[in-house]
Amino acid sequence: MNESNMENEKTPLYVAFSTQKGGVGKTTFTVLAASYLYYLKGYDVAVVDCDYPQHSIAGMRKRDAEQVGADEDYKRMAYEQFTRLGKKAYPVLCSSPEKAIATADKHIAAGHVPDIVFFDLPGTVNSEGVINSLAGMDYIFTPISADKVVLESSLSFAVAIHKLLVKNETCRLAGLYLFWNMVDGREKTDLYTAYDKTIKELELPLMKTFIPDTKRYKKELVADRKAVFRSTLFPASRPLVRGSNLEELITEIVYYIKLQ
């Protein structure tokens, strides 16, 4: 079978990190997962930035490109990486919640067939556009934190999506998985045990991997530091990945979405 026929038979997976609450790391995880899978693991990736009008990931790509253009070390890193990989940076497509799926479909129809498309959707799920886009996903991953208000909001979102979309056989959505984010090591005791019990009672799948509360998840490319963590042009640097549980999280995600 020739390669072009195989390309045509490949069905891209549509995946979103999504929850009702802002500030829980949806955009960060989208970028980290996309960059890790594309630059390190060799998967073909596209990102649809639906966070209208901010378009945070498109803004990050612009800042990353400017930083690389202005810094000799980053310029060398980029040249070496893209020469070795033999491909350009993954595309970041600007869209809106209403047009998210159409944007991805159009990109694919034009002959760009990635293995996986990540969608960065806004936190408000009270609009029809966001609900329709979530219904068009294959998998949703929801970061949760032990803050009571955030957790209650995230769980009510997850329960609603699970009931309305995952259990609805007419919808594309095959699964929604929760994972703990911003875990304070000192608190990973009775509080989390109690919350885990509640999540189990709600019959929501909880991932094994948890993400520790560490400042590195907030770091972008900066001129005076060559170690990279959150970037659309590079994967996270090995020294910064250590202890972040990022690799474990993405390995578990790959397992759940059955990425070949």
Residue locations for each model-derived region?
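Conserved C-terminal guanine-recognition region of P-loop GTPase G domains, centered on the G4
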Residues: 154-170
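Inter-lobe coupling/hinge region of RecA-like P-loop helicase motors
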Residues: 218-250
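P-loop/Walker-type NTP enzyme "switch/lid" segment
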Residues: 18-24, 39-117
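Glycine-rich phosphate-binding loop used to anchor ATP phosphates in small-molecule kinases
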Residues: 112-129
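Beta-strand-loop-alpha "switch" segments that mediate conformational coupling across diverse proteins
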Residues: 182-231
